[in-house]
Each structure stands twice: as structure tokens, then as C-alpha cells.
């Protein structure tokens, strides 16, 4: 389909629009969508836990995160994929000790939005009040930051690895999609990006 193996990573904090954009881009370009959050949720469900409980378990069990990373790296090696997750860019770039290798990413994207906007989005999506959404987001982010620093020695809030950082609160969903498409299209037309 493409003249290159396409590996696009999309990261961002909860409620920033990563899943929405990853799904839309995967559908638009005919790419697989490998979603770290979905893998994590499935693992939580398998253990009969909600995300908060499982996040706490994951703090003491690095094998959970390492398994997610391995699955994402395998997908990156197969190519023609959108990898979604806070560490997806690190995984695709081969930056983590257990998934070392060449940088396979065609484009590394980070989506962001202010906490209040993200809390409103999560509240709407999950049918909870905004205050509860804010609390859950902050708890999850705290847990993840701790895990990522302890397990990998990386700070996922360091955005220097990303090619494109976009504040999704400034544009509508369709406008955000158009901006991302405008960044991706030229890369897919080139033989050697």
C-alpha cells in the first residue's frame, strides 16, 4: 500500500484525544491500531479489577508494562500500524532497554489538552461527573509517572522525542484530524522520509 513501512505513534494523557485520533487515522490510512490502553484494560478485566486497582498492582509488577511494550514493538516491526499509548513513541523508537532496536517510527505524535478539558471529555465518555473524572485522571497519571520512572527511567512528560505536539483543545475533532493528516500525508508520499 505504501512505499515505506508506516509506524505512527500517538501518545497523550487521558482525555487528550489519542484514541479518537488513532482510530480515525487507522481507518483513514488502512492501518492496524494497537492500543496500549486496551491491552492494559483487558489485563485488568482478566483479573477482575478496575483501572485504578490494576494501576496500583502494575506499580509493583513491571511485567505488566513490559508485556504491553513487547506487544507494541512486535506490531511496530510488522509495520503499517498506529501505536497508541503514552510510551508508544519510546517503544517504536527502540528507546527502552527491553525493546532496543532501530527507530521504526514514521511519525511520533503527542496530543495534549489542559486538565479541565480532559476531565470534561472523560466525564462525558464515562458518564461520571467532572470532579470524579479529574480525580481519576490525576490518580492514574500519578501512578503511571511513578511506574514509568521506576521501570524505565524515563519521564513520559518529556516531549523531546516527538515530531509533533498538538494541543487538541484548540481545534475541533475534525480540525485536529485534518492537522494530523496534513502532517502524515507528505511522509507517506516520500520514498525516503
UniProtKB/Swiss-Prot annotation:
GO terms for molecular function: ATP binding; CMP kinase activity; dCMP kinase activity. Pfam families: Cytidylate_kin2. Its main location: cytoplasm. Its EC number is 2.7.4.25. It is an enzyme of class 2 (transferase). GO terms for cellular component: cytoplasm. It is found in: Cytoplasm. It comes from the Archaea. Keywords: ATP-binding, Cytoplasm, Kinase, Nucleotide-binding, Transferase. One of its GO terms (biological process) is pyrimidine nucleotide metabolic process. The keyword Transferase applies. It catalyses: CMP + ATP = CDP + ADP; dCMP + ATP = dCDP + ADP. ATP binds at residues 12-20. Belongs to the cytidylate kinase family. Type 2 subfamily. This is Cytidylate kinase. It comes from Methanopyrus kandleri (strain AV19 / DSM 6324 / JCM 9639 / NBRC 100938).
Amino acid at each position: 500500500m505504501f512505499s515505506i513501512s508506516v509506524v505512527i505513534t500517538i501518545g497523550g494523557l487521558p482525555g487528550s484525544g489519542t484514541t479518537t485520533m488513532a482510530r480515525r487515522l487507522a481507518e483513514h490510512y488502512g492501518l492496524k491500531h494497537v492500543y496500549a490502553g486496551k491491552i492494559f484494560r483487558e489485563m485488568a478485566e482478566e483479573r477482575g479489577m478496575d483501572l485504578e486497582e490494576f494501576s496500583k498492582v502494575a506499580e509493583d509488577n513491571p511485567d505488566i508494562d513490559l508485556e504491553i511494550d513487547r506487544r507494541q514493538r512486535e506490531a511496530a516491526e510488522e509495520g503499517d500500524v498506529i501505536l497508541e499509548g503514552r510510551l508508544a513513541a519510546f517503544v517504536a523508537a527502540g528507546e527502552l532497554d527491553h525493546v532496543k532496536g532501530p527507530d521504526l517510527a514514521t511519525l511520533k505524535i503527542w496530543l495534549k489538552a489542559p486538565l479541565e478539558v480532559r476531565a470534561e471529555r472523560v466525564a462525558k465518555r464515562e458518564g461520571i461527573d467532572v470532579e470524579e473524572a479529574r480525580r481519576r485522571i490525576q490518580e492514574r497519571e500519578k501512578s503511571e509517572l511513578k511506574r514509568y520512572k521506576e521501570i524505565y527511567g524515563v519521564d513520559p512528560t518529556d516531549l523531546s522525542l516527538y515530531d509533533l505536539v498538538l494541543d487538541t483543545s484548540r481545534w475541533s475533532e475534525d480540525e485536529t484530524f485534518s492537522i494530523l493528516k496534513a502532517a502524515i500525508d507528505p511522509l507517506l508520499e516520500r520514498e525516503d522520509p
